[in-house]
Amino acid sequence: MGKIIGIDLGTTNSCVAVMQGTQPTVIENSEGYRTTPSMVAFTKTGERLIGQAAKRQAVTNPKNTIFSIKRFMGRKYDEVPNEKKFASYDVVNEGGDARVKIGEKSYSPQEISAMILQKMKQTAEDFLGEKVTEAVITVPAYFNDAQRQATKDAGKIAGLEVKRIINEPTAAALAYGLDKKKENEKVAVFDLGGGTFDISILELGDGVFEVKSTDGDTHLGGDDFDQVIIDYLADEFKKQEGIDLRKDAIALQRLKEAAEKAKIELSSRTDTEINLPFITATQEGPKHLVINLTRAKFEAMSATLFDKVLEPCRRALKNSKLDMKEIDEVVLVGGSSRIPKVQALVKEFFGKEPNKSVNPDEVVAIGAAIQGGVLQGDVTDVLLLDVTPLSLGIETLGGVMTKLIEANSTIPTRKQETFSTAADNQTSVEVHVLQGERPMASDNKTLGRFHLGDIPPAPRGIPQIEVTFDIDANGILNVSAKDKATGKEQSIKIEASGKLTEAEIEKMKEDAKAHADEDQKRKEEIDLKNSADSLIFSTEKQLSELGDKLPADKKAEIESALEKLKEAHKAGSADAIKPAMDELSKVWSEAASNLYQQPGAEAGAAPQPETNGQQESKGGDGAVNAEYEVIDGDDDKK
């Protein structure tokens, strides 16, 4: 049985971890980093870049570089006006859903997220040396049903069976509390990430992690703080030069990177200089942006964002039915929790110094890996009791939302309630499923609708329609309605996740697999070209050193084979490169044998093209074996 990995699919960065025995391990990606930028780019040649590679080229390719896709997951086009405004890529309306347009093709947010998940899956497979097919994926606690289902769909497209969707602050609490022995510790997890904010109040004790309440804002995170700085820089430059940099995609991407860097620097310094030479040009010549930004100025500009952080904290505390002084620890999670003003607000609100013992960038993935270990049976004596973040109900007479499951109910849960018809001789009812806290149905999020028909005609109020809401451990909802008189039943699995059907998901899975195969083929081609390049270099080098010792006919054969390899390498055809390399290696090997047979030839002088070492080492640690010469070997041994 393969390992169940834990993935923190973040707005800005993603992270993957796995249980190694009884301890969770964060896995480094192929570039050597423990977190991977949640970015996908498409180059002019059609190559797909993910993570660090996508981030590196974002300035020169802003239109085709996708970031913060998590903010579009499970959302309708008309729900994301602000997110759309700040994206450098095109967000289009297709059937009411928000999709990303790259060239002639459009992608659902689930497809883009699946590409990031594929990268995390590959990272885990490289580390474990085995196929990975199962994962626990985290989501913001305040994600609604549609956003959770969209995340599950993304995992499926990436070739992963999502064993559990787990809330980010709950995952962080798992990581924080796994080794804690204190009984009944009450913990507030304050999670301010790249795009979302969650606050969860939990009680930990004797291996039980019970979520008392959760609240948050899915429109508040590091991106919003970056935007404050971007707007400030653009406004200042416009005042000075009369040019709006927001209208230039490349300049805007440079502003975005500079804003993120400035925000990070202001967490450890009181001021920073933002210096962007050649940001634009006019007839007068190039223009440069040089602006000094102080921490005090940044905090003043971000005042409304800081205010938005506290209201969910108040609601979560109230719903937990705990007193402020009962909270034992406040654990900071998410990269944006490093902002000094945020830490000061948390300290002031909770009346205690926040706990910074966990790595805010990695702790969520670690918690997901622990949950994977629990599901696999590797981690025992841990019971996780999570809650649903928002109330669930149906629309009833007068356009009112009638709640069946209240917010902060422990999941999994099942609730039944009996309703009746609103008119005489009514033979069908529409069940309009809603999620939210507002009293009127129209002010809440529609999760789905379905009809129950063939109800026997009767006076209003007589038929009995039993409606059942069933939430699984992932927080995903199933609803059914049954006419008690006839036993006729109708049900719906809520899948308002951008309306992806099973057929669409399967097609996207095939596309994703094809891309993965293409990526692997491209990597193999690059490795082959690099090997050819190395063989050309080493052959030329040793020909110049040993060419006069070779018979003329052998030297001519080598030069001819070398020329063929150069032509194949220049053409870039893998099919031509491989046989050309084999031919050159063969004729060189024959020539080397002749050298051995020459009088006075030393074993150490026999030429060896360095490609042999390189190719042989590929199956191991990727190191390249250097060309070497043994000199007085016996004397050097100690």
Swiss-Prot record:
- Disulfide bridges in this chain: none
Task: Please list where the region (Disordered) is annotated.
Answer: 592-638
Query: Among its keywords, does the record have Phosphoprotein?
Result: yes
Q: Which GO terms describe its molecular function?
A: ATP binding; ATP-dependent protein folding chaperone; unfolded protein binding
InterPro entries noted in UniProt: ATPase_NBD, Chaperone_DnaK, Heat_shock_70_CS, HSP70_C_sf, HSP70_peptide-bd_sf, Hsp_70_fam
Q: What induces it?
A: By stress conditions e.g. heat shock.
> List-wise, which residues carry Phosphothreonine?
196
Locate the compositionally biased regions of type Low complexity: 597-610
Q: Does the keyword DNA-binding apply?
A: no
Q: Could you tell me where the Acidic residues compositional bias lies?
A: 629-638
Q: Which UniProt keywords apply?
A: ATP-binding, Chaperone, Nucleotide-binding, Phosphoprotein, Stress response
User: Into which family does the record put it?
Assistant: Belongs to the heat shock protein 70 family.
Which PANTHER family does the record associate with it?
HEAT SHOCK PROTEIN 70KDA
What is the annotated role of this protein in its UniProt record?
A: Acts as a chaperone.
> What is the name attached to this protein's record?
Chaperone protein DnaK
